[in-house]
Each structure stands twice: as structure tokens, then as C-alpha cells.
Amino acid sequence: MERRVLETTEDGDTEEDTAMALQRLVELTASRVTSVRSLCVQYRLIRKLGSGSYGRVLLAQPRQGGQTVALKLLRRDSVLRTTFLREFCVGRCVSSHPGLLQTLGRPLQTPRYFAFAQEFAPCGDLSGMLQEKGLPELMVKRIVAQLAGALDFLHGRGLVHADVKPDNVLVFDPDCNRVALGDLGLTRPEGSPTPAPPVPLPTAPPELCLLLPPNTLPLRPAVDSWALGVLLFCAATACFPWDVALAPDPEFEAFAGWMTTKPQPPRPPAPWDQFAPPALTLLQGLLDLDPETRSPPLAVFDVLGDNWGLQGSGEGSGSLGVIPYKDGEEEEGGSSLEEWTDEEEDEIKDSGGMEADNRAS
């Protein structure tokens, strides 16, 4: 499968080019979905990794050898075929970047599920690391630097992730030397009509929270910048800065009041006062209330070498260095899945308790 099809050209409308390229790829892939009924013949199902209204994620080992994978199953009675194909196609096209979770093999369908394989993150998701307190400064920097690179990669291909949150950041080692952004289910070409979130979300920017049905806004990279700023705050403090970026949320009102007061008070309101000036400047840019002047994700690198004032700045092993990536490098990954079956329903029930190592929500 051609994996750089979503790159845009210098001529023509970039947003239209990306949308058309993705649509063509979805149509092409639709004829290549493999209908199968013998999952347990091809894979040993180890345990359930996560589940939700979308379906479930399973840890599986190919019976003929190869890497352990996370199998994402989407219920056919609740997910449109085109939605499934779009997520798979986007995942395959951007899998060359180490900051984005690899999508592997071929798309499949059983009588109950659409399915595809992804690389398995053995340390779970970022939310599992934030149960009690924020992370040391070095780890926070590693995380946001890798995510900033991943988002810039997506944005350079005319795509917006639109669902950046701790649950969707997969962790590959305890020191966060590699993390990857997963769940591309809401990823769309830039400019796609986007409504308000169906439920209040702390990661949604105010311009979307203010929308009333049936109004929409064109999807912009600034949505990801805002969510990256919220995620930075979460990684540093183990909590969200607000419940929703909308009045009358008191935490958001305090932040917005400080951001809009002229001249701006020298000291920000709590809990923002725990950040050193370089980190605070970064957060002010990523969380700019005006999406037109909001900083891009790569603004992270402007202050990466500065002191952010976070706890445990001397903790953590190794250097700040993260996995390098050079645009243009391609890596084919994963083995295709050949056989599927709905017999997994009974086998999954016997495979042990649910663990949150990988999430698909």
C-alpha cells in the first residue's frame, strides 16, 4: 500500500488535495478488506487490553511467530465501514513516524467486527502513569517533544488528530523515551466540518465548546495545539486544568481572565504559578484563546532546554534525547492477518481480566 499518498503538492488546494487523496485511498482499500472467520487459528489471544462502546482491543500473538500486537476490533453495528477504513488508511499512511502508533497488516472483518492490528505499547497509556502525581520535568519534556513532532508530521500532511489526550498517548518504556500518539478515529483532513464535542471535554478548545448544533467550524491544527497544552499541564500535575474550556467553569474563567487582562498581571493564578516563565510562556502560546494566534506544536522546542520549574527536575534516567525521525524515511511494519472468527467471544471471556495497557477511546 502506498503510504505517502496523503502528502500534498505545491499546486492546488492543500485541504482539498488531502481530502480527495484520503477518499481515493478509502475506496481502494474497501475492495481489499479480508472477510475471515478464524482469528483463533492465526492468533493466540492473550488478554483484553481495553473496551468501550466502539468495541475492544486485544493483545494477541501470531501463532506462526512475530511481534505481539494489539488488535483493535470495532463493532460493525456501531461503526460505519467508511469510518473504520478511514482510520485504518490514515494509520497506515503515517506509521513511518515513531511518535505515531503503527498500524500493521491488512484490514479485516468478521461477522461482528471490523479489525486491524497495531503495535503493542507494553507500558500502557499516559493516563495510567498519572494516578497520583505529575511526572518529573525530564519525562514531561520527553513526552511533549515527541507528541509535538508527531502532530507537526500530521499537520504537514494536511491532517488534524483532533483527539489528543492522555488516554491516547501510548508508552513504550517507564522513562518515556518513546511514546506514540494513537487512536486516529477522529483524525480528519484540515478544513473538515467539525461540531462541538458530544460531551464536555477538558481537552477541547473554546472555539469548539462555544458551538451550538448544527453549527460547525473548519478543523484546524490549532485544535491539536490546544490539546497539547492541556496534556502538558496534565503530565506535570496529574490533573486537568478545567472540566471544560467554557464559562462558568471557575478554573477556566480564572485562566481566561488572566490571559485577557491588559496589562497582564505579572503572577498567574494558581495552579499556573507553579510553572517557571519558559514553560508558562509555552502554555500561554498553546492555550491562546484565539486559534488564529495560537502557537504551533513545534513551539515546544523553543523552550525545551530551559527550566520549567516542575517537580523532580533532577529525576529520571538518561538524557532528553528522543527517537530521531527524518522526513522521508519509510518502514514497513507488521504482519498481515489472514484468518478471523467470531469464536473469540468465548475465548476472550476466558482470557483474564481487562487491563488498560492500550486504549482505543
Swiss-Prot record:
Binding-site residues for ATP, renumbered to this chain: L49, G50, S51, G52, S53, Y54, G55, R56, V57, K72
The Protein kinase domain, residue ranges: 43-309
One Pfam family from the record: Pkinase
Disordered, as annotated region: 312-361
Highest rank taxon of the organism: Eukaryota
Active site: D163
Record's protein name: Uncharacterized serine/threonine-protein kinase SBK3
This protein's encoding gene: Sbk3
